[in-house]
């Protein structure tokens, strides 16, 4: 298992158009301080993040879908078995119907997906769901991102421990300026406008946490990551609350 995880770090999937995003300018999270953080593995390869939103459901990006996935909860150090880890093989995926499955189209509209676990997660201090944000975030709000994505770009160096970074919600006009013609009302940009901090390859699908709730899902961004005036793009969760509730209830 440890050898497989080592291989995973060396063979993380590349992005399509917009790069799968990574955490630049991040520091190691305090172990299990983000108990909702999940890692998505295809075979032995860690390639996306996700967020536990109940004991049976995860929220992630639709472009993270694979024929089947392994989910790991309670994870911090990828090479060590530390006790609270839980492993699930998942096959029940619910991508938003508006998502364009042709990843070469560079269309990140409705880039959001629910994953149903085959059994209930065992909740503990290291495994806890995160509440969804019931309101849309405002520019200037301070938020937190986390993931095992690369900590350097364009030459990608991947961490073995979960990384965290504080970033800011940016004004919509800056998001449109950075990516003209690609930004819809259900997206938001976050990071530092001057660059140097934000998500990157391997962080896709992971959480943007604002005021202790899930406000965004990491969707995409520019390559190299965290360049000045090229912030990461997130799917704004507040626009999908009704859809999420409908899928989870039915």
Swiss-Prot record:
Q: What EC designation does it have?
A: 3.4.21.-
> Record's superkingdom?
Eukaryota
Q: Which residues form the Peptidase S1 domain?
A: 23-249
Give the record's glycosylation annotations as residue positions.
131, 166, 211
What GO cellular-component annotations does this UniProt entry give?
extracellular space; secretory granule
**SUPFAM superfamilies, per the entry:** Trypsin-like serine proteases
| Disulfide bond listed as a keyword | yes
GO MF term set: serine-type endopeptidase activity
Q: What is its main location?
A: secreted
Q: Where is the active site?
A: 63, 111, 204
Disulfides per UniProt: 29-164, 48-64, 136-238, 143-210, 175-189, 200-225
Gene Ontology BP term (one): protein maturation
- Alphabetical list of Pfam families matching this protein: Trypsin
Q: Which UniProt keywords apply?
A: Disulfide bond, Glycoprotein, Hydrolase, Protease, Secreted, Serine protease, Signal
Q: Where in the cell is it found?
A: Secreted
User: InterPro entries attached here?
Assistant: Peptidase_S1_PA, Peptidase_S1_PA_chymotrypsin, Peptidase_S1A, Trypsin_dom, TRYPSIN_HIS, TRYPSIN_SER
Whether Protein transport counts among this entry's keywords is: no
Q: In which tissues is it expressed?
A: Skin, thymus, trachea, cerebellum and spinal cord.
> Which top-level enzyme class is recorded in the Swiss-Prot or TrEMBL entry?
hydrolase
Identify the stretch annotated as signal peptide in this record.
Answer: 1-15
State the family it belongs to. Belongs to the peptidase S1 family. Kallikrein subfamily.
Name the chain's protein. Kallikrein-9
This chain's source organism reads Homo sapiens
């Amino acid at each position: 298992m440890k050898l497989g995880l080592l291989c995973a770090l060396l063979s993380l999937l590349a992005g399509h158009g917009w790069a799968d995003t990574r955490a630049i300018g991040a520091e190691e999270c305090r172990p299990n301080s983000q108990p909702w953080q999940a890692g998505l593995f295809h075979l032995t390869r860690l390639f996306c993040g996700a967020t536990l939103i109940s004991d049976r459901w995860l929220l992630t990006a639709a472009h993270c879908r694979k024929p089947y996935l392994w989910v790991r909860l309670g994870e911090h150090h990828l090479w060590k078995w530390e006790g609270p880890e839980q492993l699930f093989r998942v096959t029940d995926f619910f991508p938003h119907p508006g998502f364009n499955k042709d990843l070469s189209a560079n269309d990140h509209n409705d880039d959001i997906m629910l994953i149903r676990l085959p059994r209930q997660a065992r909740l503990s201090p290291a495994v806890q769901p995160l509440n969804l944000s019931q309101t849309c975030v405002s520019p200037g709000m301070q938020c937190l991102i986390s993931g095992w994505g690369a900590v350097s770009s364009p030459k990608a160096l991947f961490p073995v421990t979960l990384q965290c970074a504080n970033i800011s919600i940016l004004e919509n006009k800056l998001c449109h300026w950075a990516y003209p013609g690609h930004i819809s009302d259900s997206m938001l940009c976050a990071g530092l406008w001057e660059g140097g901090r934000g998500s990157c390859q391997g962080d896709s699908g992971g959480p943007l946490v604002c005021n202790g709730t899930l406000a965004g899902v990491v969707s995409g961004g520019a390559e190299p990551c965290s360049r000045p005036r090229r912030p990461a793009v997130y799917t704004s969760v507040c626009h999908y609350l009704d859809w999420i509730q409908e899928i989870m209830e039915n």
